[in-house]
Amino acid sequence: MKQFKLNAIALAAAQIALMSTHAAHAQSAQSNAAGDAPVTVVVTGQRGSIESAQKIKQDSDEIVDSIVAEDIGKLPDRSVTEVLQRVVGVTIDRTMSRGDPEHYSVEGSGVSIRGLSMVRSELNGRDSFSANGGRSLNFEDVPPELMAGLDVYKNPSAEQIEGGIGGLVNLRTALPFDFKGAKVGISAQSTYSELRKGKWSPSGSVMLSNRWKTGIGEIGALFDYAYSESGTRTDGFQVEPYYPRDDIEPGKTVWVPKGTQWRTLNFDRKRQGMYGALQWKANADLRSHLTYFKSKYEMQWDEQALFAASNPYNIGLRPGATYSPTGALLTGTMFDRVDAGINFGDDTRIANRKSDTTDISWNVTWRANDRWSFTSDLQRIKARTHGLDSTVATGVQMPEQQIDLSGNVPSLMFTDAQRAYLANPNSYYWAFTQEHLDRSEAVSKAWKGDAKYTFDHPVLRDLRFGVRFTKRDSVNENSNPDFNWSPISQTWQLGNNINNLAWLADPRFSGATHLTTFNNFFNGKANVPSLVFPDTSWATGFPNSYAALHEFHNILCAERAAATGQAQNCATWSPAKFGGNPAGINEQSEKTKAMFGQLRFGFDDWKYPVDGNVGVRYVKTEMEARGFTNFTPPTVTIPPGNTVTGPAVPTIPAFSADQAYANSYHNVLPSLNLRLKARDDLQFRFAMSKAMSRPDFKDLQGYATLTQDIKLTNFIPERRTVIDSMTLTGEGKGNPLLRPTTATQVDLTAEWYFGRASSVTVALFNKRLKDVIVQQSYDYQIPDVNGTMQNFTVTGPVNGARGRATGVEIAYQQYFDKLPGALSGLGVQVNYTFVDSSTKPYNSTFSAYCSGGNTASNLNLNQNGCDTNGRGFGDLPLQYLSRNSYNVAILYDKGPWSARAAWSWRSKNLQGINVNGTKGGDGVDTNPASPTFGQHNVGWALPLWADDYGQLDASLSYQINERTSIGLEAQNLTDAKAKQLMQQGIGQMGRAWFVSGPRYTAQMRYSF
């Protein structure tokens, strides 16, 4: 660390000295510099941006697709994530996070390229990331108003930084010398959400840039600021997983969910960005720029949700229920055969998060002579985030639920009496609280030095080589307990430590609730009953509000103790907090050292000219992690004097200690890019390379819990004990010894450019992945009392599978200039991507019958999925990968008018296997050989899929004069429904339906 700082200071001092040396020559150099053209000419307008992006693709040394801002601060969508989905081969998720599919994201979230989520993110060709336990940027955190464009590299060269098997996304900002002189850009927008009526969200940006000739050369300065708010609402229906039931319809098995539920969520976010750049050019040979980039993201959502909480095997059906051909319930009236009603929880949940990323970078480029040039680049980036997730729930026993699951969306029917019952606060009781806190910080420092030697040769063009050094420290911390679920009053506690529930009808427990009427639910397409929810203040008031609620439980507990004369049997509530458990802390330190060499060449005198580059990148990665391993010996009872037989049982002392882990590996990454020019407008590319993606930091946590499980039988009369079995197992939250996933990738393209904004391109690709990270077992050893090493089989992330992604990308764009009159402004953009994938574990974990609980150690469940009838699935594709996706955009640019209507669609994709809402531990054991056959004790986890989804967006702008334009934008014009499917033996069953409604934006722009 100290050496890195000293080197950085020395480098900076050397660069300042270099600038000072050239100051004396600046006056004579100014006359030469005055005639220099700016590095980049900013294009304006939709057509101009398409032309510029096509030119980047056509001239690039690598396979790349680009999007260029139409004007200052004007990318074609409201978020970087939504912009990326327009690129061929790129898809985005529609949930807030990949671990929580129950909450919809209006602006999109995780990005995949060619079906792979291992995507590297960069800002101006440098590392960029968020403090989220991963390695990439949360693109939704970045203000699109600060971007000049973005590039998506599909098969990067040796010169580019390693780390993205799926691809590389480089976000580009402007520099002062990109403009000929002074430049000002101002924009203002306001967005209206149709579903969240009455909510207007302002946005705006301002950019100032200028350049001056001085005594030490030309100097430029640029300042850019963006502010954006978004307020949206999402409504959702959900159906619980289906359970096999042989006790409802005589003589046959039918599949019945335990309920249908609904929710509504209001989401608010603020996004700010600040960017500044200083640029200096002493003469034609020496230039430097210093940039500062800061993005801040704040979000808060509050949700009112109903969820089924009954025992699924207590659910009964009134006569007249109907079923699908596979036996799944279609229509019927449900009731609870044991309790007074179907148990539901209805919660008020809030989540808030603040995140920021700060990047400071300094670049110096020096051309020593006609042959040699050198570049030095220094960067420091810091990312932080912290959040609170807080839930307070009441409970209600719904008398009945009449459902119709035969249509596109679940339909619910309630009588007036049932609606009145659900709207009455006296029907509810206080149920539970749950909170989670997290905070993370990551700091990275990087320096790279590159050199280029330009040949005077008919074939060899230049040789590029360089080195790069980085150091990144990361700390991710979760509260202890992680998600602290704490009961206030539950039906299963009755007769145990309480005699009554904490009913709101009891004056001691009343108040601070409200009636949610679900106005305009599903944009008026569904009529659900009003429900009583806790006030939001209970959730936002953590921890004091929680303490007050858990006093209700203490009152009930003391009441039972007084009535029975027994001692109180109630646990004291404690809030989740940081510290106290090393399982919540993940500290990582990583250093990388890389070098590369790349030769560019061109056979221009061939009949069909060929050019390209060949190179190799070598990188060494050194990782250190702070960890913790815990082992508590089991307690076994063997009567004194018994003879013990069976397998030997080692005596292992209690073990609980901090662990220091170190891991290092190196990768050699060759690459080849070739381009054949059949004509000036027709070219073909071939690219082949080896790529790598390092494990996410969250997967590298060095925490493990070890368990010694001894099963024995005591034979009392015979005075003997038989050890039936002894196993040494464990669970790891991560694995600090993970290696990167690697891939060999091949691309072949054909590109026809038949106009300035007109082209047809086709790309074939094949990626072969090795060491894909999956949940499997690895060995861990600790000594017993005799010093003999004992081997524990620990379940955690390992490099345990190989994979494949093969497909094709097709893109077409054209303006129809030859059409008559106003029609000559019409244009079209179309692209389509097909991806086929597969994974194969090194060691198969599939079992036709599931067993065990819903834990990390259940490999069959976590990798293959298990149904509620205890049967495994297997044969699942790579997650987040859609086999088909496409974009269609109708464009218009004529005179002052510019318009676009864009449709984006992707086919269904696997979101997860063991995720919230579609997992449990009460599946049926259907294995005939199992001693618990027929019991409800098997862990289950359903593969959850996002169904096909398409969305229509549109924009219209009018250029009032050279400086001013006005416009309208619309997102999700067709009010699309996002649907989720849960895979079960009876088919792909509807799990959830989400709507967020259209959004409309009015905007004005001014620039000169």
Where are these regions (language model features)?
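Outer-membrane beta-barrel signature, preferentially recognizing the C-terminal barrel domain
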Residues: 349-357, 692-761, 767-769, 788-816, ...
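Short acidic/polar hinge/loop motifs at secondary-structure boundaries
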Residues: 110-111, 126-154
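Short loop/turn motifs that connect adjacent beta-strands in outer-membrane beta-barrel proteins
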Residues: 176-182, 213-219, 285, 371-373, ...
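Transmembrane beta-barrel wall of Gram-negative outer-membrane proteins
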Residues: 197-330, 352-363, 368, 672
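Extracytoplasmic beta-strand/coil segments of soluble accessory domains associated
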Residues: 81-127
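C-terminal beta-signal and adjacent terminal beta-strands/loops
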Residues: 483, 487, 904-925, 929-932, ...
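Gram-negative outer-membrane beta-barrel transporters
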Residues: 765-769, 773, 778-780, 784-915, ...
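N-terminal periplasmic "start-of-domain" segments of outer-membrane beta-barrel proteins
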Residues: 42-78, 131
